[in-house]
From Swiss-Prot:
Residue ranges, Cytoplasmic side: 1-27, 92-98, 145-155, 212-289, 337-343, 417-432, 481-551
UniProt-listed PANTHER family: MAJOR FACILITATOR SUPERFAMILY (MFS) PROFILE DOMAIN-CONTAINING PROTEIN-RELATED, PLASTIDIC GLUCOSE TRANSPORTER 4
Compartment(s) where it occurs, according to its Swiss-Prot or TrEMBL record: Membrane
First-listed, main subcellular location of the protein, grouped into a coarse class: membrane
Residue ranges, Extracellular side: 49-70, 120-123, 177-190, 311-315, 365-395, 454-459
Name of the featured protein: High-affinity glucose transporter
Keyword Glycoprotein appears in the UniProt entry: yes
Membrane topology: Multi-pass membrane protein
Annotated GO MF terms: carbohydrate:proton symporter activity
Family to which this protein belongs: Belongs to the major facilitator superfamily. Sugar transporter (TC 2.A.1.1) family.
InterPro entries: MFS_dom, MFS_sugar_transport-like, MFS_Sugar_Transporters, MFS_trans_sf, Sugar/inositol_transpt, Sugar_transporter_CS
Gene Ontology cellular component list: membrane
Transmembrane spans: 28-48, 71-91, 99-119, 124-144, 156-176, 191-211, 290-310, 316-336, 344-364, 396-416, 433-453, 460-480
Amino acid sequence: MSLKNWLLLRDIQYEGTFYKKFPHVYNIYVIGFIACISGLMFGFDIASMSSMIGTDVYKDYFSNPDSLTYGGITASMAGGSFLGSLISPNFSDAFGRKVSLHICAALWIIGAILQCAAQDQAMLIVGRVISGMGIGFGSSAAPVYCSEISPPKIRGTISGLFQFSVTVGIMVLFYIGYGCHFIDGAAAFRITWGLQMVPGLILMVGVFFIPESPRWLANHDRWEETSLIVANIVANGDVNNEQVRFQLEEIKEQVIIDSAAKNFGYKDLFRKKTLPKTIVGVSAQMWQQLCGMNVMMYYIVYIFNMAGYTGNTNLVASSIQYVLNVVMTIPALFLIDKFGRRPVLIIGGIFMFTWLFSVAGILATYSVPAPGGVNGDDTVTIQIPSENTSAANGVIASSYLFVCFFAPTWGIGIWIYCSEIFNNMERAKGSALSAATNWAFNFALAMFVPSAFKNISWKTYIIFGVFSVALTIQTFFMFPETKGKTLEEIDQMWVDNIPAWRTANYIPQLPIVKDEEGNKLGLLGNPQHLEDVHSNEKGLLDRSDSASNSN
């Protein structure tokens, strides 16, 4: 098989678009990997700080920032991401998902340049804010794009590529940062931060060669392009394929339903009909932060300092959890579509609070005060004595096990889930608000955690353990199952108001809708529906084809 055939490369001219001169790739896995490079950038950001905060060259060059200042530098990226997430839907809904991904790449590159060239704390913060805005665009647009373009049976796998890219980005840049520790002077962090531009450049180029979201095109009455894209992804270009026609009919009927509520705004997310989805989406992203994982990522060097590890030993030990994060995410890409979202999230929550309480218990029992801090850092106020290796190893093992259960559950599951629960009309703004919530709590934790480590030390883990208990309970009672359902069926499941714990085997019966002439189009999700629409001479698909031909 040639590379062109494997990529499903098609030289299709799309009228009236900036991207019409470029051939497009229709291999859904390649599409997903390109769109989710924004996740790689997110991971690069996390590791770019965690690999540098313990180095003397970083501390000396940036005037030995205290815990509050360091929290501000770290949080500046999340602050920019929060802003970018809220702005993103205005571009994504008006100009397309691809435009948002291009803005993501452009802002990220600009921010990386400023960070690489930073002369002081202020310039570093400005660069991180701009890069953060890019990540805000990407974290809102990429999961939405992947959920809208993927066939239902593999939607979890494709959408999960975003989180997989995050884990790869963390691991890759951490090891780059570790290698740069052996370089003298400011070049150590400048090379590390400068290399952040690479995924931005790849995304900038790659977006030209992926198709637009068919659901976005349908919402903008561009049916010919919608048909071509769905056909090329699902059936190698066969527009008459039964599965292709069925997906197009689902999209068309959802567009009819959505057309009754144009100009959907953020305030509409809090109306009675939409509020349950909004609560679930916002709380899911909130819990992903409050479970403590990003604390493990941003501040892993501090954690291992508490366990008695210093210098290169600390960095090497810290890097293992980044490898585990990648390795444990890979099987989840395929298993989440087999076992479902709810079981994965609930089991993950149970094990996460187990290991958080384990870390807290070991540190509370075996650590001793460390006046003046550890290794010159007053943020770390306790340490396990060097002779107590069993306790130190217990902290390390619990940290690793936490990562092993977070990665395949709340790591990958939430970005998939929040891109599925909203309908076409709500999806851009609903996903953006959910992502903005993630970034808001990311910002708050980046500011809070250094001070928490300094003032309450091991009790910090008790707080995150309690949060993990709470998220497990809410997941059981409020998070419906979305596995194997079309996006349109998921929307109807909310309308039917089925208890979350009964949704795994529930098959929604979508309401009868009519075309503009009053003809019934049948029940969406009902096997008879396909025959109803095919036999209806005035169905929307035939009328849209006629309209295209007349034009």
